[in-house]
């Protein structure tokens, strides 16, 4: 049955469903229990499932992830919350040297069904450590799945799939979209976790994005349509692995590609996409692959945030430059 709900509520309902279905599923993190999380994504879960299933932890991200690894080795499926994107770095060692490598290190004999939830990105007027987009730092690490939903339906179903995965999943939640509402069919049959989806058909140029930038790309496509240009919008959904086949298929139709993400353009995921698509589809391209993202600079104070983040004008400028070739 379909129900309209906010993206944050969709994650809450997905966690609730997983906790109810499997006693081995646990939710852990700073203030996830009594408070229900800073963004109230876990609101009510501790009340309904108890303190042994929804666990308030100390302020120690390394310890949170390390504990989750140990629980996974004992057959549990922990879902841990990192309160803000910039707080994940104390746990980076545990994620990179242990969580990502445990399965290969044990020659496939152990599973690592751990989900690391990270609210990420800007757009809420916060400061550094609260508004960053570090997904590329994790995409470089083999052994991790990295996903970011753009809408409530994907948030619900991608969380279900992440919890059911026997491999670790870094689940980046676009906090500026937490309150965006959409239809969620809790009885649907979802597609593969890593598959991209065309959310708008077009023939003149492909816009590829994930997480918070998908909505922006749809707004860009609306603006371009007023000038008679039809842009295809591709929601990548997964940063690692990336559905290069879907990008290639779209580009070989439109012959132009602009990749949009909040993370800095320098060494961002868009660089890998640009390189791969240039290798795969060079003779189909009528313009260089362009990228729009954050600047290679520390995240600015809130009053400068709008100047730092990709916006309608910056993406439209990239579209114009691509179509001018």
Question: Residues of each region from the PLM?
Answer:
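Thiamine diphosphate
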Residues: 1-168, 172, 307, ...
């Amino acid at each position: 049955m379909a129900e309209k709900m906010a993206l944050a509520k969709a994650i809450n309902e997905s966690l609730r469903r997983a906790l109810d279905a499997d006693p081995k599923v646990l939710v852990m993190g700073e203030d996830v229990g009594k408070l229900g999380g800073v963004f109230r994504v876990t609101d009510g879960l501790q009340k309904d499932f108890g303190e042994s299933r929804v666990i308030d932890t100390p302020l120690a991200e390394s310890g949170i992830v390390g504990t989750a690894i140990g629980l996974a080795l004992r057959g549990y499926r922990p879902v841990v919350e990192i309160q803000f994107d910039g707080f994940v770095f104390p746990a980076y060692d545990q994620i990179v040297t242990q969580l990502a490598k445990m399965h290969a290190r044990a020659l496939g004999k152990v599973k690592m069904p751990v989900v690391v939830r990270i609210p990420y990105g800007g757009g809420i007027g916060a400061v550094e450590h609260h508004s960053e987009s570090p997904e590329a730092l994790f995409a470089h690490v083999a052994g991790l799945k990295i996903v970011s939903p753009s809408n409530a339906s994907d948030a619900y179903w991608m969380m279900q799939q992440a919890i059911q995965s026997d491999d670790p999943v870094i689940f980046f939640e676009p906090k500026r979209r937490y309150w965006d509402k959409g239809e969620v069919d809790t009885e649907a049959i979802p597609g593969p976790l890593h598959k991209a989806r065309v959310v708008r058909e077009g023939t003149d140029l492909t816009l590829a994005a994930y997480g918070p930038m998908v909505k922006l790309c749809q707004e860009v496509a609306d603006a371009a349509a007023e000038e008679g240009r039809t842009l295809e919008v591709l929601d990548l959904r997964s940063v690692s692995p990336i559905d290069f086949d879907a990008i290639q298929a779209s580009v070989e139709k439109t012959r132009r590609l602009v990749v949009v993400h909040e993370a800095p353009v320098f060494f961002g995921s868009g660089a890998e996409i640009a390189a791969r698509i240039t290798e795969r589809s060079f003779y189909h391209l009528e313009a260089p692959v362009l990228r729009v993202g954050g600047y290679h600079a520390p995240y600015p104070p809130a009053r400068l945030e709008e100047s730092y983040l990709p916006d309608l004008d910056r993406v439209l400028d990239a579209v114009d430059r691509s179509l001018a070739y």
